[in-house]
Amino acid sequence: EEFKFEELDFKTTRMFLAPISIVFMPNNNCITDCIYCYADTKTKPTQMSFDQIKTFVREAKELKVRDVMITGGDFFMYRNWSELLHLLIEEGYAPDLISTKVPLSPKIIETFEQFNIRLQISVDSLSSSITQKVLHVNENYSRNMRQALKDINASSIRFQVATVLTNINDSIK
């Protein structure tokens, strides 16, 4: 009896008719194959075309979705990453933080710098022998990451470094 109503209002506009936020994963590709990673990087789903992504983001805006969060795979391995950032910012969805393990080239750094978005660089070690064990990367990865960190530090990009400690990289040696 308590919840028995004579009339229900289905006409009044509700505050939220769509999700408040959307988590979007442009790809599940990664430059590393970390020993601690739980992501399914073996499955290669069909990626949405950039036109489909544009439609998706614009529909989210029309539905008054408040936030679109980017996750991945590695963001910089998505071929249209710059265009995606332009689109998100244009539609009012500027990401707060982009995370990567890619040793960024000067060209990528220069392009990313214009967006004024914080960058999180994942660095589990700068020792080539350790990164080869922990990340399953080639011997040049550590050298390239070291140079990328210097280049990022010399830029205007706000950044932070994240590290996952394992029994392989748990010392300062």
Which stretches of residues belong to each language-model region?
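N-terminal pre-core extensions flanking Radical SAM catalytic domains
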Residues: 1-44, 61
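Radical SAM/AdoMet-radical enzyme domain recognition
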Residues: 50-70, 78-173
